[in-house]
Amino acid sequence: MRVGCVCYATSQGLGHLAKSFYDAGVITDVMVYRHPHGTPSHMEWYPEGTMEITSRTIAGPEVERFLDDIDVMLFFETPFDWNFPNRCHERGVKTVLIPMYEWFLEHPRHKFDLFINPSLLDQQYFPDGIHIPIPVEPHIQWTRRTEARRFLHNAGNIGSRNHKGTLELIKALAYVQSDLDLTIRCQKPEGIYKLLKEAELPKGAVVPTIIAGEVQRRELFCPTYDVYVAPEKYNGLSLPLQEAFASGMMVMTTNRFPTNQWLPEEPLIPVASRRITQVMSGHLKIEESVVDPVTIAACLDQWNGQGIEKFSLEGENYRTANSWEMFKHRYIEALESVL
């Protein structure tokens, strides 16, 4: 069985996700789709000869030749060009989507042969699919943490609707009473400085360390940090939460479904309210959690300097139970089931 994929090859969530499946041997053939924001593609991630799609449409003689030997096309979140999966069906190629519920269209223009849902929340949105968790990447190494001393937030490129809660975390710094050591990592510093200006922190507030630039996951979740803070507003799948936990960090995120089903509950941040929204017009309606900066600050103060070894050990168990060795065969069986 030959499994094709069209994907980003960038040091961001979808790029890392596709590379993980390729490195595990689930995906056999790749077309790289150039990121619309101009983020460089890491063509070296894939074999020599892998082509890069530089237009919005996925069509043409090279694409047709690519499909000649493909049995199943696997997509992550989006096919980029909705005409392409329809063309796959015309060519007799099966289509499988690993969806991110918040980015799925209310009126999709293609009927996928199978949904492989990465979270229990995605399973609720796509009940005809099957739920298989995303495995932890092998390069995520576990390190024992014993005390909550150094806190980390990964803002990335901020994301749609500030869904990572970066602005709320920054606003919380005005209310933190303890001596907090917080680092915020981001792709580009402009976005963080804009949020810092918007937050209007008073004199004397905690000043975070800002580190900008592309970073590999193994560097992000290294032993330098003890606690990962991410007051996320929505998400079914969150690779940073998963990888931080698997690396041995204590994870402080919003107490919401489905992350509260697999993360330790004690450090989770209470939700002030919930509302129904859309990430963009035409997409599925979703529930968004609202978190109060004062509550975030109280949680940071509560855990700063506290013992966290039991959470670190739980992360080690999670890493073992959610390895590629545990789940690769389930993905292969799911893909074979559509043939």
Predicted ranges, named:
Residues G4-C5, M31-Y125:
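Extended catalytic core of nucleotide-activated donor transferases of GT-like folds
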Residues H35-H37, L121-D122, H131-Q141, P189-E190, ...:
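Short beta-strand->alpha-helix junction loop in the catalytic core
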Residues H107-P108, F126-R150:
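Acidic anion/phosphate-binding donor-loop and adjacent secondary structure
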Residues I140-K164, I170-Q177, T183:
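Conserved donor-binding/catalytic core segment of Leloir-type glycosyltransferases
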Residues Y193-Q216:
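Nucleotide-activated donor-binding/catalytic signature segment of Leloir-type glycosyltransferases, i.e.
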Residues K233:
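Aromatic "clamp/platform" in nucleotide-sugar-dependent glycosyltransferases that forms part
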Residues M250-T253, N260, P270:
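Short hydrophobic beta-strand element within catalytic cores of glycosyltransferases
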Residues E287-I296, N304-E336:
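A charged, aromatic-enriched C-terminal amphipathic alpha-helix characteristic of glycosyltransferases
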